[in-house]
């Protein structure tokens, strides 16, 4: 749906099953579908303006590292890749002169605050949190279904558990 909505010309789907399924359903001559990032080198004469990296968990780190050389700016919505692989990401960013913009709210706020030359003398940054949905409940009485039941939206199991247990704050 998004590829059609934004008139995407090139799409990379790394997961082989998803790639085959999508390609079968979208036999559109206007859309080039690839199964690896190396294929992009064949079609790009110059760098892409923006790339969004939003694969959940550490699965997003390798594709993020692979695409950096093909893009002017990489927008990363994957906090696990930033936290666990920042030294690798930063090395590739410098090597390929690619700009970085984090999308996750806490990472974006910190990044944005440090972009202002007046704020370059920051010593500490404090990240606050509500305490989560189980702050005043006994852990013995909390069930898996409680943690998976987000009151506002469906986020999938991993993100719901990370949110309910405050693990997302560790990554942030």
Feature map (PLM): residue ranges:
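Conserved beta-strand edge residues that scaffold enzyme active sites
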Residues: 17, 81-82, 107
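Mid-domain beta-loop-alpha active-site segment that forms a flexible
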Residues: 104-109, 152-172
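Short, contiguous clusters of charged residues that form electrostatic/catalytic patches at enzyme active sites
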Residues: 38-41, 62, 108, 171
């Amino acid at each position: 749906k998004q590829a059609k909505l934004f008139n995407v010309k090139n799409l990379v789907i790394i997961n082989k099953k998803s790639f085959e399924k999508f390609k079968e359903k979208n036999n559109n001559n206007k859309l080039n579908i690839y199964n690896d990032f190396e294929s992009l080198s064949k079609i790009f004469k110059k760098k892409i303006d923006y790339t969004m990296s939003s694969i959940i968990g550490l699965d997003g780190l390798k594709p993020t590292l692979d695409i950096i050389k093909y893009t002017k700016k990489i927008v990363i919505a994957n906090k696990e890749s930033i936290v666990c692989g920042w030294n690798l990401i930063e090395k590739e960013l410098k090597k390929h002169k690619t700009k970085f913009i984090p999308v996750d709210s806490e990472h974006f706020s910190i990044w944005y605050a440090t972009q202002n030359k007046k704020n370059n003398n920051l010593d500490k940054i404090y990240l606050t949190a509500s305490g989560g949905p189980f702050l005043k409940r006994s852990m013995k009485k909390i069930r898996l279904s409680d943690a998976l039941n987000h009151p506002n939206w469906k986020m999938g199991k991993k993100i719901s558990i990370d949110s309910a247990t405050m693990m997302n704050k560790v990554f942030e």
